[in-house]
Curated annotation (Swiss-Prot):
It is found in: Mitochondrion inner membrane. Gene3D superfamilies: 1.10.287.90, Cupredoxins - blue copper proteins (2.60.40.420). Its EC number is 7.1.1.9. PANTHER family: CYTOCHROME C OXIDASE SUBUNIT 2, CYTOCHROME C OXIDASE, SUBUNIT II. Residues 46-59 are mitochondrial matrix. Component of the cytochrome c oxidase (complex IV, CIV), a multisubunit enzyme composed of 14 subunits. The complex is composed of a catalytic core of 3 subunits MT-CO1, MT-CO2 and MT-CO3, encoded in the mitochondrial DNA, and 11 supernumerary subunits COX4I, COX5A, COX5B, COX6A, COX6B, COX6C, COX7A, COX7B, COX7C, COX8 and NDUFA4, which are encoded in the nuclear genome. GO terms for biological process: ATP synthesis coupled electron transport. Its cofactor is Cu cation. Cu cation A2 binds at residues 196, 198, 200, 204. Component of the cytochrome c oxidase, the last enzyme in the mitochondrial electron transport chain which drives oxidative phosphorylation. The respiratory chain contains 3 multisubunit complexes succinate dehydrogenase (complex II, CII), ubiquinol-cytochrome c oxidoreductase (cytochrome b-c1 complex, complex III, CIII) and cytochrome c oxidase (complex IV, CIV), that cooperate to transfer electrons derived from NADH and succinate to molecular oxygen, creating an electrochemical gradient over the inner membrane that drives transmembrane transport and the ATP synthase. The gene is MT-CO2. The keyword Thylakoid does not apply. This is Cytochrome c oxidase subunit 2. Binds a dinuclear copper A center per subunit.
Amino acid sequence: MAYPLQLGFQDATSPIMEELLHFHDHTLMIVFLISSLVLYIISTMLTTKLTHTNTMDAQEVETIWTILPAIILILIALPSLRILYMMDEINNPNLTIKTLGHQWYWSYEYSDYEDLSFDSYMIPTQDLLPGQLRLLEVDNHLVLPIELPIRMLISSEDVLHSWALPSMGLKTDAIPGRLNQATITSTRPGLFYGQCSEICGSNHSFMPIVLEMVPLKYFENWTSSMMSTS
């Protein structure tokens, strides 16, 4: 999760987020080199006497500043396209979760189980326990197993919402009448927090998401207990 005064990204919890962090560093390095070159050229022009002010043709220079930007764009585009392909690729998911956005809460349905679904509401500030996070805690966590590919089917019952988990590198719009899908694969257990990331009304900021990733054994015990109490 995020911390006060944090400047960087949250710790990666999924292979996709790890790839996004590498891509961010890769792109930032290219931008830094370009910025350094531009600043060097500007400082040189300001501190030295201009020469060749009457040059009408410079074929070599024009060739360089046409080809070099194209190469730079390719170096940025190739890893970006690779990550986009990875985010859209869903191969043999072990579990399918249907997520529906409402004003202003989330509902989850475990499609592989006969009758396992629930709503997830934010816990009001006055009901929080010591150590719980304001505007981020919910009454029912979305519990999923770690190290397994999970397909998320995301839609909305009313207006536009967006189901976002920064540590997973995941942000998928929930659109009425349309079913979007995403993949979750967690590399470690824990609690991971997100929020609705599309303005959806007066209580938009009160739609937190809490994902609880647990080992498969604990997940099976949890599903059994949930189905026995429903």
